[in-house]
Each structure stands twice: as structure tokens, then as C-alpha cells.
Amino acid sequence: SLLFRGLLNPGDDHRGLRDIVEVRITLDNALTEPVTQAWKNRQDPELDTLVEEIEEIASKRELFTDQDRRFHMRLLEPLDNHLFLHLTEAFWAVHTLTVPLLGAPRPEDMVATARAHRDMFRAARAGDAQAYRQAVTQHYAPLLAALT
């Protein structure tokens, strides 16, 4: 199972979790066009509130796990293919269960990741695929650093 792949294999330098993160990055990048098209000029008070909550919690150097999950799920809800939503949720669950075992995230990483959420949503709302991809890269940078 994905969870066991992320948790076990102690001698593999977290290879299983890196594999999962790489698939999440690939999926997020593959969904750039549908996400930016679905959200272009779209108002959503729920996502606005989630982004504000994420930034507020991160500024206190606290984890924003619930808000993070809701953000990623809400971002994909307008897409026609709900399998994307289910895959993202499965990968998100594995990654949030296993990342604390790495001693991550560091406080400064939480702030950077919170900012990346705002950048992802801002780019999606602007319909800016290039900025969205850059924000996805920023979103995963702290996690990838913790895995190397």
C-alpha cells in the first residue's frame, strides 16, 4: 500500500515518500491547464478564507493540516474528472502521515508553503498557467529538501 511504502523501508532514504511526492508534483503540474481554466476570474470565499487561515496558522509556526487538505480538495472540485480529486486526496493523506516522521516541516518552511498556497490560488484565479506551475514548485520545495 502507499502508506506502507511511505512509512516502511527504513534503509531506502525515504525513497517511497519521495516517489509519492514526485507523483503529486507531476499530477499538480499535469492539472495546471484545467485548474487555471476552471478558476480563471472565479470568486470563492471558501478558498479565500482557507488561504487566510493557512497563512495565519503558519505565521504562528503551527501546522495547518486540515486547511491544507481542504485547500487542495477545493481547488480540484470544479474539474470534470473526480478521479484527480481522489488521487490527490490519497497522496495527500500518505504524505501528511509520513512527513512528521522526518522532523518536518520546519517553521520557516511552513511560512513558505503557506505563501505558495496563496500564489497557487492567485495564479489559478488569474488563469496564469506559468505562475501556477511556479507556485506548485514553491509548494513542494521544502518537502523535497527534507527528503534529500
Regions found by a protein language model. Name each.
Residues 16, 20-23, 43, 50, ...:
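Amphipathic alpha-helix face/heptad-repeat signature
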Residues 75:
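Short basic (Lys/Arg) and small-residue
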Residues 24, 28, 38-39, 72, ...:
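Short, cationic motifs built from Arg/Lys/His that form the positively charged side of catalytic pockets
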Residues 48-56, 70, 89-148:
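C-terminal all-alpha effector/ligand-binding and dimerization domain
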Residues 12-14, 59, 79:
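Acidic, Gly/Pro-rich loop/turn segments at junctions of secondary structure
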Residues 80-82, 127-128:
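Short loop-to-helix capping motifs
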Residues 34-38, 54-61, 124:
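Secondary-structure edge/capping motif, primarily at the C-terminal ends of alpha-helices
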Residues 1-33, 37, 148:
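Short linear motifs at protein or domain termini
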